[in-house]
């Protein structure tokens, strides 16, 4: 949900420099209405997944997403006000929307999505054992981190910003390359580089495409020629590969999801009326 909300918020800021709470609320809810109308029949009901402020990855790697604060400081936008609004809308959606809204201490939305996709796989095995078709899962996000989840044949991914399906990439090869290259946007260097090079603004050690192509098909023991390289490879694997989500975090996500009771759909009209979402009142039965 963070991506959906920020995308709508940035569109609103492109129209006016002032942050308009009502406009952002309306845009986000209208997006949800459109997605539900398009995808519910095939994929079932929404699960809205949110990042928690505390990340287990930052406990494991203190520089995780360490470059983002610096980038926000360079931005012309007031990110304190933006986060305040996003948190307010999240609380409203948890209270009023008739869907499971999931936030777990220590987890990112990526973790929640990955764990629930894997959990659906176990449920699908039981369905198939009973001669029933598996349940399809759709990830509504353009984030390429989710390509690795497409190794599960029942998972599809749709990029709502580009309005196109994410497909054509080998999930196994993609995750292998991703571990080697790291993720600059998350402050994760390539595996040849030390922990702090990105947050300190230093250049990473060059990693040629020909070596990525070669090593992505090999075991790390074949090319990590020193203990330091192996440690840095494992650093990246732990942060990037969803198979490395800690067991206790996975269990907490499942417990939280299963305990959630969505808000009553019959109360949705009152929420829309209170916030002057008049055109959505007439569409309330489609939420």
Give residue ranges: language-model regions.
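Low-complexity, acidic/Ser/Thr- and charged residue-rich accessory regions of DNA metabolism proteins
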Residues: 242-243, 247-287
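Helix-hairpin-helix
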Residues: 142-148, 168-231, 240, 246
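Noncatalytic, basic helical substrate-engagement surface that gates or grips nucleic-acid strands
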Residues: 1-138, 151-164, 241, 247-248, ...
């Amino acid at each position: 949900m963070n991506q959906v909300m920020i995308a709508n918020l940035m569109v609103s800021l492109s129209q006016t420099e002032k942050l308009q709470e009502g406009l952002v609320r309306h845009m986000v809810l209208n997006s949800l209405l459109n997605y539900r109308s398009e995808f519910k029949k095939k994929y079932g009901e929404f699960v809205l997944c949110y990042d928690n402020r505390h990340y287990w990855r930052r406990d494991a790697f203190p520089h995780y997403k360490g470059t983002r604060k610096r980038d926000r400081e360079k931005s012309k936008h007031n990110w304190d006000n933006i986060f305040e609004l996003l948190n307010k809308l999240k609380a409203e959606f948890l209270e009023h929307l008739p869907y499971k809204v999931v936030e777990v201490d220590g987890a990112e939305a990526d973790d929640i999505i990955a764990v629930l996709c894997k959990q659906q796989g176990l449920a699908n095995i039981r369905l198939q054992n009973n001669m029933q078709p598996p349940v399809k899962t759709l990830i509504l996000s353009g984030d390429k981190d989710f390509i690795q989840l497409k190794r599960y044949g029942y998972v599809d991914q749709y990029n709502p910003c580009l309005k196109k399906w994410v497909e054509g990439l080998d999930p196994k090869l993609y995750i292998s390359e991703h571990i080697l290259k790291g993720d600059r946007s998350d402050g994760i260097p390539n595996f040849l580089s030390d922990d702090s090079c990105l947050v300190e603004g230093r250049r990473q050690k060059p990693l040629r495409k020909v070596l990525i192509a070669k090593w992505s098909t090999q075991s790390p023991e074949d090319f990590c020629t020193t203990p330091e390289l192996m440690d840095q490879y494992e650093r990246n694997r732990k942060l990037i590969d969803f198979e490395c989500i800690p067991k206790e975090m996975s269990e907490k996500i499942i417990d939280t999801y299963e305990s959630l009771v969505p808000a009553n759909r019959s109360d949705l009209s009152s929420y829309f009326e209170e916030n002057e979402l008049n055109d959505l009142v007439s569409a309330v039965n489609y939420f």
